[in-house]
């Protein structure tokens, strides 16, 4: 008999859950390939550490964007490798529950099913991310009383009201963690003449990012290259600056919640 597996195939991270073991994979949704041979060099954390550091022959990339697959072959290979790492092959072809954004097309849904099925999965069941988030938070989604869930991921923010076991109303916007990283990169380039990668921007966001009552004004040292000379350069960014960058995106999310 196949075993049940839950897969959260996110824009930024991929997580795999087994009923008897809990979360067995929690890795960045990144894959590194050899551009000459198409060989897979690394996936997950190892590939993430290569972002912005590969030679011209290799490329480290996110094969998902905005919660949907942008490179089917790379996602297929990434899933196969991650599943092989948890040794499910000898158990048989398992049944899988996979999370998807609340507002994607039927074509995009089919791409997720096909990518997972190609790894030897017998059956794939799709669950909308707000439903999975609510269940994970212990919310009774069968209650007649509506509950609102705001799931801020890497590529999308999913907003939904759930009641009686389903979604009453939902909205998905492409303003989330990755958009914040992109805004940090643009800000640093404009103010400090400093080029940084997505990994550095994300680390700064996690370390000192805050909206509202910031409290102590902390700093984070950014390392990158000078836009003009290309030479190594570093600069300190403050939590006040990160807060100013965050405001527009968080305001948009709040507006969508209230609308």
Language-model features: where?
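Nucleotide/phosphate-binding catalytic cleft detector across ATP-hydrolyzing
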Residues: 1-152, 160-259
């Amino acid at each position: 008999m196949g075993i049940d597996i839950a897969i959260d195939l996110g824009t930024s991270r991929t997580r795999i859950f087994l009923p008897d073991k809990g979360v067995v994979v929690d890795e960045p949704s990144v894959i590194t390939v050899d551009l000459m041979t198409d060989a897979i060099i690394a996936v997950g954390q190892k590939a993430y550490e290569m972002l912005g550091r590969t030679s011209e022959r290799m490329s480290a990339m996110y094969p998902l964007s905005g919660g949907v697959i942008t490179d089917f072959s790379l996602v297929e290979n990434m899933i196969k490798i991650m599943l092989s790492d948890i040794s499910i092959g000898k158990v048989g072809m398992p049944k899988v529950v996979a999370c998807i954004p609340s507002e994607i097309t039927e074509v995009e849904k089919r791409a997720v099913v096909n990518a997972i099925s190609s790894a030897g999965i017998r059956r794939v069941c799709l669950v909308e991310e707000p439903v999975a988030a609510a269940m994970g938070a212990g919310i009774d989604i069968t209650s007649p009383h509506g509950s609102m869930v705001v799931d801020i991921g890497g590529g999308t923010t999913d907003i939904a009201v759930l009641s009686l076991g389903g979604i009453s109303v939902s909205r998905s916007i492409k303003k989330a963690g990755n958009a914040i990283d992109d805004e940090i990169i643009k800000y640093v380039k404009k103010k400090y003449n400093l080029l940084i990668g997505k990994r550095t921007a994300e680390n700064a966001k996690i370390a000192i990012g805050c909206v509202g009552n910031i409290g102590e004004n902390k700093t984070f040292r950014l390392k990158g290259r000078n836009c003009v000379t290309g030479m190594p350069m570093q600069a300190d960014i403050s939590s006040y600056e990160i807060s100013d960058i965050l405001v527009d995106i968080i305001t948009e999310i709040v507006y969508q919640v209230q609308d």
